[in-house]
Design a protein with these regions (language model features):
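Charged, often Cys/His-bearing segments associated with DNA-binding zinc-finger transcription factors
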Residues: 1-37, 300, 307, 323, ...
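Basic, short loop/linker segments at the boundary and entry of helix-turn-helix/winged-helix-like folds
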Residues: 20-61, 65, 100
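Generic structural signal for hydrophobic core residues of well-folded globular domains
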Residues: 30, 59-65, 108, 343, ...
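Short, positively charged, Gly/Tyr-enriched micro-motifs
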Residues: 48-116, 363, 368
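Polybasic low-complexity intrinsically disordered regions
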Residues: 75, 98-241, 245-256
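Helix-centered, glycine/charged polyanion-binding patches within enzymatic domains
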Residues: 237-351
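Basic, amphipathic alpha-helical segments enriched in Lys/Arg and hydrophobic/aromatic residues
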Residues: 328, 334-397
């Protein structure tokens, strides 16, 4: 079963516009003055530099225009006067040099300004109703490094790029040298709410608790949706502590035998060995009924062998007795499957970042600069959503 979800904004629609039309709409959602102020030099000496707000605009426009290098951005600013003007840079002087662009990017990194801007935009999207935040999907994506490949043992000591491996949707094992981008995405809008960058060898499940906690600071989450790679008790416990439910398929590799009279997915079996019928939940208690009474099986003993009631035997399970095995709603129920299919939202968000933007076309090295690069790409998605929402409301007025 596949559920087609509609995004609240069309990033692809913004992409279809010509650059001269797209950039004014995109910049209309951004007030970069507070961030640009922190990028200005405090020294009274030296010549006046380029407008820091203009350079910050250019660095944000670069992923939108599929520009992945400082050299490419300098060339575009130098050759395209309309682009330079729309970024807010003066036309009566030369375009910012590659060194200037690189220096401002380094300042963004050292002061964590990209992260601050990202978090502020997430808050704005939440306030304007673009991000819902009740259902959040978490996953990681492979990011190839712009760094010299090193042996695994040596690269693990640097804390930067490393060798990683994972299986794709078709079961093929993929290896790469670089990083992992870990994303927490609102399933309704398909917009990022939190991100982390790690060396490629770091296991996905180790980052999930931190992402959950970051998201929970801004919104009340009901469900965290993750794939089987996150099937670890600590992820269920973290979701539980945040008053949410983790929706994660069980990874049955190396799985121990379930308790007697219980299936691996947490469904109890009747005395004849038939799986009982899930009949809803009240709080942390799951209710299961006799499968013969609900018409799921034709038991040779009927209901009388287990219960004198026409309702049939009832078994109640406390989900807190095993947070990993039991879930509310029950594993493999219709509602559980509907929630799990929302996980495709994070895959689509990853695809936008890597296909339409420059998340996987890096020309910076070191984990801190790589993280800034990923934040700039995520900011483009958030700003695009705000811009398109504002543009649509003006058009409707």
């Amino acid at each position: 079963m596949y559920i087609l979800q509609e995004s609240l904004f069309s990033f692809e629609e913004l992409q279809k516009l010509e650059s001269k039309e797209r950039l004014p709409i995109f910049f209309s959602a951004l007030d970069l003055r507070p961030y640009a102020k922190e990028l200005r030099s405090r020294s009274p000496r030296g010549a006046d530099g380029h407008c820091r707000q203009g350079i910050l605009r250019a660095l944000l426009a670069a992923p939108l225009e599929n520009i992945s290098t400082f050299t490419g951005l300098h060339r575009r600013l130098d050759m395209d006067l309309r682009f330079r003007y729309q970024c807010g840079l003066r036309l009566d002087r030369e375009a910012p040099s590659v060194a200037t662009l690189s220096r401002v990017f380094a300042d963004l990194t050292s002061k964590d300004l990209a992260k601050r801007l990202f978090e502020d935009l997430v808050t704005r999207c939440k306030q304007e109703g673009i991000i819902d935040g009740c259902h959040v999907a978490i996953d990681s994506a492979a990011i190839h490094a712009y760094e010299k490949k090193q042996p695994k043992r040596k690269s693990e000591l640097t804390g930067n790029a490393n060798w990683g491996a994972k299986f794709d949707s078709f079961g093929n094992k993929i290896k790469w040298f670089g990083y992992k981008l870990h994303l927490a995405v609102d399933t309704k809008s398909e917009l990022p709410m939190a991100l982390e960058v790690t060396p490629a060898h770091v296991h996905d499940g180790d980052l999930a608790p931190n992402l959950m906690e970051q998201v929970a600071v801004r919104t009340k989450v009901e469900f965290f949706v993750l794939d089987a790679g996150y099937d670890q008790l600590k992820n269920y416990e973290t979701a539980r502590n945040l008053k949410a439910q983790a929706i994660i398929p069980m990874n049955l590799r190396n799985e121990k035998e379930p308790p007697a009279g219980m299936m691996s997915n947490g469904t109890p079996c009747c005395s004849m060995g038939f799986p009982m019928t899930y009949w809803g939940a009240v709080g942390d208690i799951l209710k299961f009924r006799c499968p013969h009474a609900t018409g799921k099986v034709d038991c040779p003993l009927g209901m009388a062998a287990c219960s004198s009631s026409n309702y049939g035997m009832v078994v109640k399970v406390d989900t807190t007795s095993d947070l990993r095995r039991y879930s509310t709603p029950h594993r493999d129920s219709k509602r559980w499957k509907e929630l799990y299919h929302e996980r495709t939202s994070v895959e689509r968000c990853n695809a936008r970042l890597k296909t339409f933007l420059t998340a996987d076309a890096m020309h910076v090295w070191g984990i801190r600069k790589v993280t800034t690069h990923q934040y700039l790409n995520a900011i483009v998605l958030l700003a695009s959503a705000l811009a398109m929402a504002g543009h649509s409301s003006k058009a409707a007025a």
